[in-house]
C-alpha cells in the first residue's frame, strides 16, 4: 500500500548540503517505490518560494514545497523559526495528510524539530552529525520530542552513539546513500583528487610533497566547503596542481569519474568517500592519518606505483558503493515506514451491538480510604457517585485491591456499575491501572511484567496520566514498545497541574488510534466526576471495550488548589486521629 511521506530538512534547498542530497536521493527512490513524497524545506531562491506559496494555496501535492526563506541555523541558538514559516509548516502538514513525517537533524532549532513535535503522523528522525544535537537544551523537551518519534535513524555509528546520549532509544544505522547513476567510473587517468578544507591541510601538504616523486601524475584539490584563503601550492608543482570547487554533486561527478586515486579528508564528508567509491576510484585512506599525515603520502605512492592494486581497489570500491545506493537506502527506509504501520489502530466509530443501551457517565479513576493518601470511605464514595449522576466508576486504589473488592460487594443492589481495579506502581516507569481485576497485583515490577500480570487476570490495561512529568511516567521507548498492550489511554485526568499533559495524551491517543479514557483521579468526594466518559452502558470487560468506541470525553474541572487543599486537610485530620 503506497504511503504519503513528508521529508523535512532544516537546510536551505537552494544551497548545496549533504543532508539535502540525501533527502533528494531517497525522495526520488521512494517515489519509484510508489509512494507520494513531499519535501518541506526553507529556500533562498525566489522561484522556490513563489512555487511553495502557490502549492500551499492550491493544496497541491508538490515534490518540494519551500515553506519560507532560509535563515541561519546556530547550534547554540534558541528556536528562531519565524511565525510565517511556522504557519506554512502547519498548513503543509494539515493539507498533506501524511502517513509518515521524517525529520532530518531535529537536534537543531529548526522546522525539522517543529514538524516532529507537532505532527500526529508516524514520526522518524535521522541524525547525521554529532555536532548538530544541541537542541532542545531542556531534558523535558527532549523527552517530549522522543515521545512523538517512532523510529530513530543515524547515518553512522558515531552519530548514533552521540545522538543516543541526548535522545535515548534504539537506533537503526543506514548509509547516507549515493547516486550510482550520476557517479560512475569514467576513463581513468593519472589524477589524484584530494578533499580540501580547513581540517585537511596537513594531509594535503603531505600529499603534495609526495607528488614530487610521482612524475606524470596531477592533483586536484577539491573544495567541498567554502574556504577563506587559497591553499599554498609549491612553485614547481603549479602546472600539475589545480583547485576545483566540489560543492555541487554534478561537479564532483565529473572530477571523480576520471580520478584514479582519491584522498578523503580525515574529518571530511562521508558522502565524498561513497561518491569516490561509486566512481571507481581507489581510496588512499589509511587509519591514523589524522595524527600522522605522512601515512596518506605513503598510501598515495603505493597506489600510484601499483596499477594492479589500484584496479582491485577500484572494483571493491564500486561494489561497496552499489550496496549503499539511494535505491538500497530507500528500500531500508520503506521497510522502517511499513513496520511502523502496525502501531496505529483503525478508528472504529460504529454503533455496534450496544446502540440500544442507555448512555451513562463513567469515571474511570478514583480512590478510597484503602489508598494511603485518601480518606474516602467506600459507602460514602458510592452514595456520592450516584448523587453526582454517575452510572459507572472504577475503584483504582494505589497498590491495593481491597477497596475495589469492598466496593463491588457494597454496590450489589445499586444501579451503579463498579469496575474493580488497582493503580499499580512499577519499578521506575510510572503507574499502570488494571481494570476488571480479580486479585491484587504487587507493586515494584517492571512495566511489561505489570501488564502481563493484568493480562493473567483477563483485565483491561488502562494507562493513567502518561505524560504527567511532575511524577514518574513511562519512558518514550517503553510506550512505543508496549503500544499493542495498551487497551485504554487516559487522555483527561482532572488532577493534573498542567493541562498540556492531557493535551499531549490526547494527541498520542489520536495518533495511534488508542481508545480514550478519562477520570477524576479523585482523592476527596468533591473531586468525583470531574473527569468522565459519556458511554453506553456495559457489562464486563468485552462490552466495556466495545462501548469505548463511541465514548465521549467530558471535562468538568474544579479548582485544583481547592481539591488539593481538601486532600491535605483530610490527611492532616487522619494523622491527628
Question: Which residue stretches match the model-derived regions?
Answer:
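Nucleotide-activated donor-binding/catalytic signature segment of Leloir-type glycosyltransferases, i.e.
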Residues: 229-248
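Conserved donor-binding/catalytic core segment of Leloir-type glycosyltransferases
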Residues: 6, 186-212, 220
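A short, well-ordered alpha-helix in the C-terminal region of glycosyltransferases
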Residues: 302, 309-323
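Membrane-proximal helix-turn-helix segments that form the acceptor-binding/catalytic region
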Residues: 130-152, 159
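Charged catalytic cores and adjacent phosphate/nucleic-acid-binding surfaces used
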Residues: 342-368, 372-383, 402-409, 413-441, ...
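N-terminal strand-loop element at the rim of the active site
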Residues: 3, 9-14, 28-80, 224-228
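Carbohydrate-associated surface elements
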Residues: 43, 158, 177
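C-terminal alpha-helical cap of glycosyltransferases
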Residues: 302, 326-347
Amino acid at each position: 500500500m503506497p504511503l504519503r511521506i513528508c521529508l523535512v530538512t532544516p537546510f536551505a534547498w537552494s544551497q548545496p548540503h549533504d543532508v539535502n542530497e540525501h533527502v533528494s536521493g531517497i525522495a526520488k527512490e521512494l517515489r519509484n517505490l510508489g509512494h507520494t513524497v513531499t519535501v518541506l524545506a526553507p529556500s533562498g531562491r525566489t522561484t522556490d518560494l513563489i512555487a511553495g506559496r502557490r502549492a500551499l494555496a492550491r493544496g497541491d501535492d508538490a515534490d518540494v514545497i519551500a515553506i519560507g526563506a532560509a535563515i541561519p541555523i546556530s547550534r547554540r541558538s534558541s528556536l528562531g523559526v519565524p511565525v510565517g514559516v511556522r504557519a506554512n509548516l502547519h498548513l503543509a502538514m494539515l493539507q498533506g495528510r501524511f502517513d509518515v513525517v521524517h525529520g532530518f537533524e531535529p537536534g537543531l532549532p529548526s522546522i525539522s524539530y517543529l514538524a516532529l513535535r507537532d505532527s500526529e503522523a508516524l514520526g522518524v528522525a535521522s541524525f547525521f552529525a554529532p555536532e548538530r544535537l544541541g537542541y532542545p537544551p531542556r531534558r523535558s523537551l527532549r523527552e517530549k520530542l522522543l515521545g512523538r518519534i517512532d523510529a530513530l535513524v543515524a547515518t553512522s555509528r558515531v552519530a548514533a552513539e552521540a545522538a543516543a546520549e541526548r535522545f535515548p532509544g534504539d537506533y537503526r544505522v543506514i548509509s547516507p546513500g549515493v547516486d550510482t547513476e550520476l557517479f560512475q567510473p569514467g576513463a581513468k587517468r593519472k589524477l589524484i583528487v584530494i578533499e580540501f578544507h580547513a581540517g585537511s591541510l596537513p594531509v594535503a601538504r603531505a600529499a603534495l610533497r609526495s607528488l614530487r616523486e610521482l612524475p606524470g601524475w596531477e592533483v586536484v584539490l577539491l573544495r567541498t566547503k567554502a574556504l577563506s584563503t587559497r591553499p599554498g601550492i609549491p612553485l614547481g608543482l603549479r602546472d600539475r596542481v589545480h583547485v576545483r570547487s566540489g560543492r555541487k554533486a554534478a561537479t564532483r561527478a565529473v572530477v571523480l569519474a576520471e580520478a584514479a586515486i582519491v584522498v578523503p579528508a580525515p574529518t571530511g564528508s562521508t558522502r565524498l568517500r561513497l561518491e569516490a567509491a561509486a566512481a571507481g576510484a581507489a581510496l588512499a585512506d589509511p587509519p591514523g592519518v589524522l595524527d600522522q599525515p605522512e601515512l596518506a603520502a605513503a598510501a598515495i605512492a603505493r597506489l600510484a606505483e601499483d596499477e594492479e592494486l589500484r584496479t582491485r581497489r577500484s572494483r571493491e570500491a564500486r561494489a561497496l558503493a552499489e550496496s549503499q545506493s539511494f535505491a538500497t537506502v530507500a528500500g531500508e527506509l520503506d521497510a522502517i515506514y511499513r513496520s511502523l504501520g502496525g502501531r496505529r489502530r483503525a478508528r472504529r466509530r460504529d454503533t455496534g451491538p450496544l446502540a440500544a443501551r442507555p448512555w451513562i457517565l463513567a469515571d474511570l479513576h478514583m480512590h478510597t480510604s484503602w489508598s494511603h493518601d485518601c480518606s474516602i470511605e467506600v459507602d460514602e464514595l458510592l452514595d456520592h457517585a450516584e448523587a453526582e449522576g454517575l452510572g459507572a466508576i472504577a475503584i483504582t486504589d494505589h497498590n491495593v485491591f481491597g477497596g475495589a473488592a469492598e466496593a463491588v460487594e457494597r454496590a450489589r443492589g445499586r444501579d451503579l456499575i463498579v469496575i474493580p481495579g488497582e493503580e499499580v506502581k512499577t519499578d521506575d516507569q510510572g503507574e499502570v491501572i488494571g481494570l476488571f481485576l480479580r486479585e491484587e497485583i504487587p507493586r515494584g515490577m517492571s512495566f511489561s511484567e505489570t501488564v502481563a500480570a493484568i493480562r493473567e487476570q483477563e483485565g483491561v490495561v488502562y494507562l493513567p496520566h502518561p505524560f504527567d512529568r511532575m511524577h514518574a511516567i513511562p519512558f518514550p521507548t517503553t510506550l512505543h514498545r508496549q503500544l499493542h498492550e495498551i487497551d485504554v489511554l487516559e487522555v483527561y485526568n482532572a488532577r493534573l497541574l498542567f493541562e498540556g499533559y492531557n493535551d499531549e495524551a490526547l494527541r498520542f491517543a489520536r495518533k495511534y488510534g488508542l481508545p480514550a479514557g478519562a477520570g477524576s483521579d479523585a482523592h476527596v468526594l468533591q473531586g468525583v466526576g470531574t473527569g468522565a466518559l459519556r458511554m453506553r452502558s456495559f457489562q464486563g470487560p468485552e462490552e466495556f471495550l466495545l462501548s469505548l468506541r463511541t465514548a465521549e470525553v467530558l471535562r468538568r474541572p474544579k479548582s485544583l488548589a481547592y481539591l488539593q487543599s481538601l486532600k491535605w486537610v483530610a490527611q492532616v485530620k487522619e494523622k491527628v486521629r
